[in-house]
Amino acid sequence: LDREGLVFSESSFISDFNAIQTAPRVKRSAIGEVFVNWKDLRFDATDGDQYFQKIDINGEIQWGEGILLDENEFTNFSARFSAGQNGDVNIAYELGTFPNIEIMMQNISSEGSFSFSTPLNISNKDGYQFAPNLIGTVESGLFVIYADESSGSIDLKVQKVESGYLPSWDDNGITAMFGLGGDINYTSSYRVDDGEIYFFWEDNRSTKKIYGSRIT
């Protein structure tokens, strides 16, 4: 769509492979490329797998049948992603089976190949980590935000990923808030400058309030 309405006279398939595809998400890069994520049932008819497609500025798909995010035997889901600066896309996602869920990260290059053979384990801890969010680029500051319930209570964690895709902070990231339980809703994050974000959420621990934090 543009300001005048539909751009193409006919819609196009997101993948060259004919399979059931559900739950699409879309992000646009700074230069107009579009990345699409969906749950694909071609190999797993129950839980599905996370797939990605890149669409160029002319509306043409670039990655054929789509890119399977993780070939691990464990279920991969809840993918969140952010366009890079070189035609690539950064992805954070959940991997595993409850109650043992890890937050993983992968980068798909502009050509449709993985930037590292083994996904980066962001949480790297036993127990339940969930609800990843991702903002920024490695050049300007890439932050992965997630919930950690490994201690029994829910902590809000943030990890910064440096150039070369190495975690910046020890202990699986900094703990932005402790013991949130189920009282946090509607998280939002905004890039302010290189290596700096504002993070907001609805906090219901005592009464409904909007909280925010600056993370550098």
Predicted regions and their residues:
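Extracellular, repeat-based ectodomains that mediate carbohydrate processing or recognition
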Residues: L1-T216
